[in-house]
């Protein structure tokens, strides 16, 4: 956001009472005031001119903390901001400042994009986060409400949610969610599960889509009476024959004319 940097008297600053805002805890303000006392205000407040005074657009917490330590002059960037966009920056600041859960943050970004007709790219440029981050975050809203509730309650993490979303089928997603809860899967465990699950799905689909290989598999099973796995296609691949005991192995090889 373009603007003019200046130092102004703190008494000329006013809080915008129209800003949507949750209460600011005294503990947070005291911690911030200590930081300001030691290091100064590292990031100027964003303000706009209102008659002979200035209205705070972004930086209310810094303003309040500065007042706690009786700071007299404060760094600001004065901007000329359209009336229709005045509430945009405070909304974004609130989201980034508060300890939102991923679900709350996702809903907030989605609402902002809808309200201001922004694309994910537009929003990413305005708030300094990557488009991929926003995309992944908003995507979790596609999950079932039960899963969203679990994320909100911190029973599963945002990382878990991204892994669940890697599955296309909703029933598969829900099953993975239940497994994560039951087996207390870490994100890495969930990723391994999806990798193995995806391999089995691909293998199953290959056979389903190739009647010739499926017929071969059924023929071999009838002849050998054990688990058969065919990997590949009609031109190249491999056949795996499983045995479960020494006797089973002898029985299978004897079918090919081997005698022990």
UniProtKB/Swiss-Prot annotation:
Transmembrane segments: none annotated. It comes from the Bacteria. InterPro entries: Chromosome_partition/occlusion, Cro/C1-type_HTH, HTH_ParB/Spo0J, ParB/RepB/Spo0J, ParB/Sulfiredoxin_dom, ParB/Sulfiredoxin_sf. Pfam families: HTH_ParB, ParBc. GO terms for molecular function: DNA binding. GO terms for cellular component: chromosome. Belongs to the ParB family. Involved in chromosome partition. Localize to both poles of the predivisional cell following completion of DNA replication. Binds to the DNA origin of replication. NCBIfam families: parB_part. PANTHER family: CHROMOSOME-PARTITIONING PROTEIN PARB-RELATED. This is Probable chromosome-partitioning protein ParB. It comes from Borreliella burgdorferi (strain ATCC 35210 / DSM 4680 / CIP 102532 / B31). The gene is parB.
